[in-house]
Amino acid sequence: MSKVLTSLPAGERVGIAFSGGLDTSVAVAWMREKGAVPCTYTADIGQYDEPDIDSVPGRAGAYGAELARLVDCRAALVEEGLAALTTGAFHIRSAGRSYFNTTPLGRAVTGTLLVRAMLEDDVQIWGDGSTYKGNDIERFYRYGLLANPSLRIYKPWLDAGFVAELGGRKEMSEWLQARDLPYRASTEKAYSTDANIWGATHEAKRLEHLDVGVELVEPIMGVRFWDPEVEIAPEDVSIGFEQGRPVSINGATFESAVDLVLEANAIGGRHGLGMSDQIENRIIEAKSRGIYEAPGMALLHAAYERLVNAIHNEDTVASYHNEGRRLGRLMYEGRWLDPQALMLRESLQRWVGNAVTGTVTLRLRRGEDYSILDTQGPAFSYHPDKLSMERTEDSAFGPVDRIGQLTMRNLDIADSRAKLEQYAGMGMVGSSQVSLIGALESGGAEAIASRGESSGDELLDRAAMESGTD
């Protein structure tokens, strides 16, 4: 049975995720006029595009909300973001820059905590401003039902009656003015913005066109680092981690993780760190484009991955990247709380994050231009003396050891040569490969694998094989 209502449930209480903007203000007033009982819930997620979040619930009453609540989600959102940082749950990357999944993180938190707040008020119907073409409609649907299995969904923008009457911003503003309802006129931007404490997303409108670049965006968490008239002085910053968790910035600790993230945002923001321009696949497989800000996450991520590389071996680092990308995709799809995501998340936090303790010092300049000045920690796998070209005492291995190691490689090199000879005989190896290694005449593999030793050695080898010794 469908959980989605396609028409207004008159006479029933409907919870609306209320931002105080034009869309949700009109939705509340329209539902009240048509006979529903709107109840508004505003999430405080540290959004940088709303400087006066405390005043938002008060505005809802003017539009007919029966009750209006502000739900503080900042601490929960910061914790989920730190989990994403520890697990590397970021799958969208382009030319070395990552999108840190800041919007999907926000949806996981608001999609559950707002519905739980509604449950406290016995509100069983939920609506929000997501549209049918985007990702959020599915994310909110999944998280809402996880938090309240009896939840029903009503979205004004899926109601043909609402869309027919109030199909655009012009119609919405005129509708409010005709009823003498307050309307905060705002300058029409060339793009839309959605933000929380971890980052900001800019998309749609002019940004849908790929002949428009990042310069169109006015950053809300940082500076226009591409503008030469913006002065940005170099700055050194040290980030301390304990068991995969950032605990200090420049040696200072903080009363809460929220305060630490705010400080990281301030430092990264004044250098324009963490802005990226991405083309991505939405959940419905259509491609979209977004320009993202995440100055604090980018700063913490740079320091964290430096420590990951210093502490863990190659296979562990590879698993961290591979499983982190899978986890990032699950989060993007609204599956951050699904069992398959929890399995990946717990494993990465336990076996990768828990070992990450240390301090990294970076010198920030403009945008992504930074240097790592120092990396310190108590349990590194990095030991420069192991590979030093200088003479060292008690070396881990010597020249003779390396000769033996290279000799053991003859087996797989011979296998590769044999396959190349086979492919050459089948006409599969082209001129580009031949130009590198020459003509592939038969017999090369045997020459590589041959030891060239005495007949006595051959007798020993034969005896070992016949006796089954491996």
From Swiss-Prot:
Q: Which GO terms describe its cellular component?
A: cytoplasm
Q: Please tell me where this protein is predominantly located.
A: cytoplasm
**InterPro entries the UniProt entry points to:** Arg_succ_synth_type2_subfam (IPR023437), Arginosuc_syn_C (IPR048268), Arginosuc_syn_N (IPR048267), Arginosuc_synth (IPR001518), Arginosuc_synth_CS (IPR018223), Arginosuc_synth_type_1_subfam (IPR023434), AS_cat/multimer_dom_body (IPR024074), AS_multimer_C_tail (IPR024073)
UniProt-listed Enzyme Commission number(s): 6.3.4.5
Q: Where is this region: Disordered?
A: 448-470
Determine if Nucleotide-binding is one of this entry's keywords: yes
Swiss-Prot/TrEMBL keywords: Amino-acid biosynthesis, Arginine biosynthesis, ATP-binding, Cytoplasm, Ligase, Nucleotide-binding
What's a single GO MF annotation on this record? protein homodimerization activity
Q: What are the coiled-coil residue ranges? A: none
Q: What is this protein called?
A: Argininosuccinate synthase
**Which organism encodes this protein?**
Kineococcus radiotolerans (strain ATCC BAA-149 / DSM 14245 / SRS30216)
Q: Which lineage do the record's taxonomy fields give for this organism?
A: Bacteria, Bacillati, Actinomycetota, Actinomycetes, Kineosporiales
Gene symbol here is argG
